Amino acid sequence: MSSFDLPAPSPPRCSPQFPSIGQEPPEMNLYYENFFHPQGMPSPQRPTSFEGGGEYGTTPNPYLWLNGPAMTPPPYLPGTNASPFLPQAYGMQRQLLPSDLGWLPIPSQEELMKLVRPPYSYSALIAMAIHGAPDQRLTLSQIYQYVADNFPFYNKSKAGWQNSIRHNLSLNDCFKKVPRDEDDPGKGNYWTLDPNCEKMFDNGNFRRKRKRKSDSSSSTSSLASEKTENGLLASSPKPTEPQEVLDTASPDTTTSSPEKRSSPAPSGTPCLNNFLSTMTAYVSGTNPISRSVATPGLSSEPIDKMGQNSLNFNSYTPLTNLSSHGNGGEWANPVATNALGYGGSVFNQFSPHFYNSINTNGILFPREGTEV
């Protein structure tokens, strides 16, 4: 390095290539001038004055210097005060050169795949070892040896996976312990495969697999079917319910039990729909006939007003079942009707919650002479 004097202003030809961003002292510009040649573009390139100049060729990217030994940074460029065009990771990137990874031989892709954890469970590894044995049985040490020889991944941390092998042998029902014969030298029992557990490995494919739905549901299919049948029988209607419906449709509904009177009425009964529409028209005052018809024994108060006072549709509850086939005589024979065109026997078929508000004994609908 030649001696030089520190000028007050920095050289003008270095400022375009190496702009100062306020992080390095002004003296660094002079170092850039003496040790780095200006380039046509400010893109990061390896300077040609390092390590003898002509020994290395110029490369477009300093992160791809993988053709030579590692370089040491010059003493005048510490890592904390690196220039803007040399990033902070420049010194760290050189630690990952192939020369530093010489202990890792990768001759082929197959060798690389042996260093990856195999996609087999410990139970599958045990099954593979036992299945490949001549006598279809192995000792614990022989299973260890098979796993270590065929899968180099398990050469490290042997204590961990060997403990898992022992747990799988003792807890998995697919592995059976066979005592050693008296004339067989050595120690330790043999382990063999249960013939009933062949399905867990998919016909020789020892990869991890999900449990089949057919296998999981076969053991509980009969129990589930019995529960379903019992539930359907419990939710089905009793055979005596139609008889109860016929009983509730008889005229002596007032003497029937409360359970029978609480049965819901079918919504599609035409007689009931006609009756409700007529009653609604009567209460709202849209029926012109109801205003002019008078009933003997009533006061001078209009009928529509009395109907509004006596009828309370807000407290209306579902009516009992009305059967149009059980009482055909009442509907077929002509009877005397009241102002709404219905006989008194018709109102006896509804629940007491409804006709408690309708006096069927002489206020609106007299019953004298209406019974057949």
Swiss-Prot record:
Primary role: Transcriptional activator required for the development of normal hearing, sense of balance and kidney function. Required for the expression of SLC26A4/PDS, JAG1 and COCH in a subset of epithelial cells and the development of the endolymphatic system in the inner ear. Also required for the expression of SLC4A1/AE1, SLC4A9/AE4, ATP6V1B1 and the differentiation of intercalated cells in the epithelium of distal renal tubules.
Record-given protein name: Forkhead box protein I1
UniProt xrefs under SUPFAM superfamilies: Winged helix' DNA-binding domain
Keyword Hydrolase in annotation: no
Low complexity bias locations: 216-225, 247-257
Native source organism of the sequence: Mus musculus
GO MF term set: DNA-binding transcription activator activity, RNA polymerase II-specific; RNA polymerase II cis-regulatory region sequence-specific DNA binding; sequence-specific DNA binding; transcription cis-regulatory region binding
GO biological process per UniProt: inner ear morphogenesis; positive regulation of DNA-templated transcription; positive regulation of transcription by RNA polymerase II
PANTHER family according to UniProt: FORKHEAD BOX PROTEIN, FORKHEAD BOX PROTEIN I1
Annotated spans, Disordered: 1-23, 202-271
Disruption phenotype: Mice are deaf, impaired in their sense of balance and suffer from distal renal tubular acidosis.
InterPro entries: Fork_head_dom, FOX_domain-containing, TF_fork_head_CS_1, TF_fork_head_CS_2, WH-like_DNA-bd_sf, WH_DNA-bd_sf
Gene it is expressed from: Foxi1
GO annotations of cellular component type: nucleolus; nucleus
Pfam family, one: Forkhead
Keywords carried by this UniProt record: Activator, Deafness, DNA-binding, Nucleus, Transcription, Transcription regulation
Tissue and organ distribution: Expressed in intercalated cells of the epithelium of the distal renal tubule.
Entry's localization field: Nucleus
DNA-binding region as annotated in the record: 117-211
